[in-house]
Amino acid sequence: ASYTPSGSAEVLSSTEFGVTYSGVDGLTVGYATGTDGGAGAASEVDNRNAWATYAYGSVTVGYQSNSSDSKVASADKDYTGMVITYTVTDELAVSYGTSEIDYELNAFDQESTSVGASYTMGSMTLSGVHNTHDNISGSSLASADRNVYELGLSFAF
């Protein structure tokens, strides 16, 4: 649970709470809701978020759905995302994910995909991800599309 009182930097209070349940082996589900009034009552946003992950053997699957309902006209957003991860060996894991954001105001949905892999050897992990994002912020312009490559190297001591 979270509460942000109004003050000199906040016009209105914000309150959020969430619940997570993991009573079934390998399954975790959760729900969170809240009201963000930090920008003032006229632009208050009600947020809802539900998610689930399930791990069975070397496969983990996840799903998430968010909804933001704003008092500002045509500012609502809905998000859905899914991911699957496969642990090939103790050292190697691969993943694939996809997500979509539906903007109430825009005719185009933002769509993203991600492909990643990580390799761990001792205390060192090498990882790489390729992300594609189409129609960022609901724009149909070609400049609103992105390909992103990330490489990571981490050490644990």
Model-identified regions with their sequence ranges:
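Outer-membrane beta-barrel proteins
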Residues: A1-F157
